[in-house]
């Protein structure tokens, strides 16, 4: 069993700046703010995970997990209507692809001012994306923290994760149970 990683290194951005950066600016539409930030967090997570793809293979990570007690099954509304066990890289690819498809879908993420966001935007679309992206962070922490450290990406990882968690908590996008794989780590 893998040893828990050491305490996080200093962040690249001070915590008070991260806390300020997640607050909805006065006069900003909440859905626009959620959409813009989800796109940014998707890109951050994708970049971090992308640096680990040589270490995260179907052989090294035959299931999508975050430690010994958290295995995740994939389901979606098109290909996998029943939950299915995928390797971590397959799960993460499906997850990132589904978020990218949603980001590109005008009916979900409208780019024209006159077009409204769907009624279930925050409660379903954004919340599900956040829950699943957190699983990627948890997988990286549990399964690939050594590789992150060897690549010199620890500060990037912790800054990205903390920003993500602060935003998720600010808007109620992550629940206490979502943090279970990183219990005690995300207490910000």
Which residues fall in each region the model found?
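Eukaryote-biased recognition of C-terminal alpha-helical segments
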Residues: 154-188
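Conserved, folded interaction/cargo-binding domains in eukaryotic regulatory proteins
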Residues: 118-164
């Amino acid at each position: 069993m893998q040893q828990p990683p050491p305490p996080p290194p200093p962040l690249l951005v001070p915590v008070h700046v991260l806390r300020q950066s997640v607050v909805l600016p006065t006069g900003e539409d909440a859905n626009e703010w959620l959409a813009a930030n989800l796109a940014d967090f998707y890109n951050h997570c994708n970049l971090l995970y992308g640096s680990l793809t040589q270490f995260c293979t179907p052989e090294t990570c035959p299931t999508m997990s975050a430690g010994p007690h958290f295995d995740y099954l994939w389901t979606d509304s098109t290909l996998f209507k029943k939950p299915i066990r995928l390797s971590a890289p397959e799960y993460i690819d499906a997850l990132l692809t589904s978020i990218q498809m949603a980001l590109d879908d005008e009916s979900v993420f409208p780019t024209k001012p006159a077009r409204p966001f769907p009624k279930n935007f925050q409660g379903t679309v954004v919340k599900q994306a956040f829950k699943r992206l957190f699983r990627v962070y948890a997988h990286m922490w549990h399964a690939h923290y050594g590789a992150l450290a060897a690549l010199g990406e620890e500060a990037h990882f912790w800054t990205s994760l903390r920003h993500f968690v602060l935003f998720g908590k600010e808007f109620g996008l992550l629940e206490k149970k979502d943090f279970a794989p990183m219990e005690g780590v995300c207490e910000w």
